Amino acid sequence: DVVLIQGIEPNMRWQQFTREILGLAAELEVSMVVTLGALLSDSPHTRPVPVTGSTSDPTLLETYALEASNYEGPTGIVGVLHEACQRFEVPSISLWAAVPHYVGQPPCPKATLALVRKIEDVLDIPVPLGDLVEEARAWEVGVDELAEDDEEVADYVRQLEQARDTTELPEASGEAIAREFERYLKRRNVD
């Protein structure tokens, strides 16, 4: 089973909020806490949305190819929640989609889709997508049209594409292909 909690980040009483979340997690016998978020980045909208993940759990680091959580600085409720999870020995992962900063107004269905696909990998479950794939395509087409109308933005997007294409090789490892095929088979059983 999956328990979803959606809401606005609280402005105060973070410790109380965290206690309530962890109390609910204990009551429901949650085996892992996964938080999702988005951050503005210099990613072009024309490429797959990068999803990064972090954890302080050494086992999860290796299992899901995540980064060690080593951030120091101002934090939000996600940082407080993950620190509490670590204290109470509840495995936790934080996943973040990189949204192009030049179209940072929510919603961003393409980023949502990228996060859902990562959740499928982490939890090893198929997630019904409904209209999300079509919404992500429509979002990208809409941003394409906006960029075409402004030559300065179009040039900027091309620069971002070139930078991204030269720094990242396409993911075509055997493991990535197998993971995508497994996702396809699971989705066929859900749809």
Predicted regions span which residues?
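Acidic-aromatic/histidine active-site loop/patch
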Residues: 37
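Accessory terminal and edge-of-domain segments that mediate assembly/interaction
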Residues: 1-32, 40-191
